A protein has these predicted regions:
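Zinc-dependent deaminase catalytic domain
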Residues: 1-135
């Protein structure tokens, strides 16, 4: 753990509060050379209603925080190659595939997702993964 991990993961937790999702709010920050280059939180695509659930089920088109942060940096024309992703929940397998393809070299998270296949895939791809405890 480096001295900035705690600060960035706390910032990701604050960013998660922007999510309209009721079941779980997740925030993500992409950091490169000690600068935040992108951010994201889980929610519906731009232009859609700000409701993530229908009844007690998450709508299938809700984007995860990691996907939002990665697509945002790609849209800006910047590169996430070699960046660190700070995310409040461990990535699912779909987000892990995006993380690998985006060239992100390190993932720091605070809460466990119900499945750990995403973490296993990241490690298999040589991405450094670290869980940090936040009080």
């Amino acid at each position: 753990m480096n001295k900035f991990d705690d600060k960035y993961i706390r910032m990701a937790r604050i960013w998660a509060t922007n999510s309209y999702c009721k079941r779980r709010q997740v925030g993500a920050l992409l950091v490169k050379d000690k600068m935040i280059i992108s951010d994201g939180y889980n929610g519906t695509p731009s232009g859609f209603e700000n409701e993530c659930e229908e009844g007690n089920v998450t709508k299938p088109y809700v984007l995860h925080a990691e996907a939002n942060a990665i697509s945002k940096v790609a849209k800006s024309g910047n590169s996430s190659e070699g960046a660190t992703l700070y995310v409040t929940a461990s990535p699912c397998i779909e987000c892990s595939k995006l993380i690998i393809q985006a060239g992100i070299r390190r993932v720091v998270y605070s809460d466990d997702y119900r499945l750990d296949d995403g973490i296993q895939l990241l490690r298999r791809a040589g991405v450094e993964v670290e869980k940090v405890e936040v009080e």
